[in-house]
Amino acid sequence: MDTQSKIILISGPTASGKSSFAVLIAKKINGEIINSDSMQIYKQLKILTARPNKKEQKNIKHHLYGIADVKINFSTGQWLKLTIKKIKEIRRRKKIPILVGGTGLYFQSLINGLVTIPNIPMKFRNKIRLMQKNNGQEAFYKNLLKIDPKSKNKFDPNDVQRTVRAFEIKSYTKISMYDWLGKTKSNFKDKEFLKLYINFDRESLIKRISQRTSKMVKIGAIQEVKKFNKLRLKKELSANKVIGIEELTKYLNSE
């Protein structure tokens, strides 16, 4: 397999071993690893996001891990800009860029490009979120299809985040999110990407997730959540979506 001109994309479910697999490949083909997980971006959440530790990063360069503060929303556009720069730098060093992640939108933006959708005022966005909450997801999704039929079959009808995003874009710009996405252009050719997907059967994956969760608690996940909660972040910040924060907070509050 000729990998010299490739950009390797590794994806898969939580606890499927993407990070360790990426290191294994990087050692064999002289690669460097770029983070493509939107939560491993945040520096204060090392344990809960399963960010590669110093031992795992030894001898292999890792990029874009723990670079953003949880007090900010780190956008897909910011990630894409930094990633394109890193890919070019890695290639100049005659090495292979290996991207590892669980964030589909990141990979999608790299492969297809990212269009600049006009900024939507937070007041307007909050209004749409409240509408979704009051209507319920099922009714809200049906309303989306009425104003934006192009959203049909594009994502899971139960995906609140994507439904709200599609609704606010169509409502504010009068243009479907999928028409905006049609205007994109990538910095790379499709043939440059080598896509690898790791998967396990359901039973094995559940076991791996359980083992990972136990390990996280042992190495300080509860303490990490305590520190995070002391920051008293605004609810709309992305870092609040890290899996484990809500669950461990309820545990700490004895709920």
Where are these regions (language model features)?
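Phosphate/pyrophosphate-binding catalytic cores of soluble transferases and nucleic-acid-acting enzymes
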Residues: 1-255
